Amino acid sequence: MIWFFVTLTAAWVVFNVAASYAPLIIAERISPGRLPAELLALGEARYVRFYVGNNASSYAFSAWAPPLWTVVVFDRSFFRKASPELVRFVVAHELGHAASHHHIWRWFAVVTGLALFPAVRRMLARQEQTADAYATFLTGFKKEFFSQLK
């Protein structure tokens, strides 16, 4: 009986680790020359891989690809049409998530079911504010500036 639970737990862990790679199935890797070089020179960018794919819900998102990588997937139409300033801010925002290890906390909260609790959801929402502050620090742009561009 114990082997059943051990096997089930192992399968659950493998599934959740493999699910982190799902956004990359139809995404294409972005060459570093298309992104802001000064932001890619930062230490946080060493373990970040950038991709472009179909993601109509936001400009970009970052996810943890265990054990080492953070992947950032840009929306294809956003990446094609966005101004260089907006791309710079979004890259800095996603690097803020990587620097603060937000993707690991978010993955853990979702996989364990803790994301259902209001206190944890508030913590996850504050992560966006932290990443915005990091991007503002790196680029000098405030998030409100880009709301005028839409």
Predicted region positions:
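Catalytic Zn2+-binding segment of zinc metalloproteases
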Residues: A92-V111, G140-K143
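Peri-catalytic and regulatory segments of divalent metal-dependent proteins
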Residues: F15-V91, L95, S100
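Alpha-helical membrane-targeting segments
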Residues: W64-P66, I104-R122
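Short helix/loop segments within enzyme catalytic domains
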Residues: I25-V52, P118-K150
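Hydrophobic alpha-helical transmembrane segments
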Residues: M1-A11
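Generic hydrophobic alpha-helical membrane-segment signal
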Residues: F4, K81-E85, V120-M123
